[in-house]
């Protein structure tokens, strides 16, 4: 199945990272689980569960499944009837909390990146999004079976950051013949950073050593929170970056003109135009930019 940029955009716009639930039973690929406190990781086939752990239909109990998920174990299959809580099903990740997805296609696979909300649940850490400094990445070649490639430790790659939220990614083949990936992220609410790689799962480098966008940057006087980047590359290979955020009250304003867009330089690490305001009705945050069949699509959140 060929995955197109249209599918990537649809995937990002859909309920991609919903409330954690259990994946379909059977031979599904979920990737590697997170290591436990001892540094080990593994999977569990709950078809070997004892009779006391199954209900009358021969299906492993919901309590057993959720207990396994909470302990960081991936369930490969379920005995008896297939268990699936359709109201709380995450089609990509049954045990890793994620948010703010962005996607890119490469070599027949779709790579999806998200904010690593799992950090909020880790023992011994401050359970607050204000301390998130990593992203996560998954991939698929059929939109059904997913591989978890682990974390992108942005805080180690770029030690100057405050946070890494809400990524947006773009790629293109450059003069060296390699595909280069540009992964933009929110540096908290204060700006936008970017890391780069020639492989969709890294290793990643910090080419600037500082933010690409920051508060009080010339041209951003009415953009109080220049975060939530949205990047795309058009048919001419030109990159564009949108971003911006206001306050919840701005979501009640028809013409705040808070979000901005600018043409990126050839290096994708600088700007080649002035910032232009986007007149997005009732804009609040969560900019995203897609270029599909000659049309630019700008999506955002109003609340």
Task: Label every model-predicted segment.
Residues 1-10:
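Bacterial N-terminal signal peptides that target proteins for export
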Residues 30-65:
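Post-signal peptide N-terminal segment of mature Sec-exported envelope proteins
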């Amino acid at each position: 199945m060929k995955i197109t940029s249209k599918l990537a955009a649809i995937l990002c716009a859909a309920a991609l990272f919903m409330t954690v639930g259990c994946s379909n039973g059977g031979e599904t690929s979920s990737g590697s689980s997170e290591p436990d406190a001892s540094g080990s990781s593994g999977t569990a086939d709950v078809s070997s569960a004892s009779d006391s752990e199954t209900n009358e239909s021969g299906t492993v109990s919901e309590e057993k499944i959720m207990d396994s998920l909470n302990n960081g174990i991936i369930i490969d299959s379920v005995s008896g009837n297939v268990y699936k809580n359709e109201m709380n099903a995450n089609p990509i990740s049954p045990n890793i909390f994620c948010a703010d997805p962005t996607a890119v296609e490469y070599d027949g696979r779709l790579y999806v990146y998200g904010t690593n909300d799992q950090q909020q649940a880790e023992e011994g850490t401050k359970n607050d999004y204000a301390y998130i400094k990593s992203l996560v990445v998954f991939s698929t070649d059929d939109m059904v079976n997913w591989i978890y490639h682990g974390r992108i430790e942005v805080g180690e790659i770029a030690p100057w950051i405050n946070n890494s939220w809400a990524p947006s990614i773009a790629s293109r083949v450059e003069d060296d013949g390699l595909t280069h990936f540009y992964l933009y992220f929110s540096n908290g609410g204060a700006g936008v950073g970017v890391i780069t790689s020639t492989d969709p799962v890294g290793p990643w480098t910090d080419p600037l050593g500082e933010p690409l966008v920051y508060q009080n940057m010339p041209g951003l006087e009415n953009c109080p929170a220049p975060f939530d980047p949205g990047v795309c590359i058009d048919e001419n290979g030109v990159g564009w970056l949108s971003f911006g955020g206001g306050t919840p009250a701005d979501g009640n304003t028809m013409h705040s003109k808070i979000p901005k867009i600018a043409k990126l330089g050839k290096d994708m690490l600088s700007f080649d135009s002035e910032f232009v305001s986007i007149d997005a009705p009732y804009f609040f945050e969560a900019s995203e930019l897609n270029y599909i069949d000659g049309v630019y699509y700008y999506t955002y959140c109003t609340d």
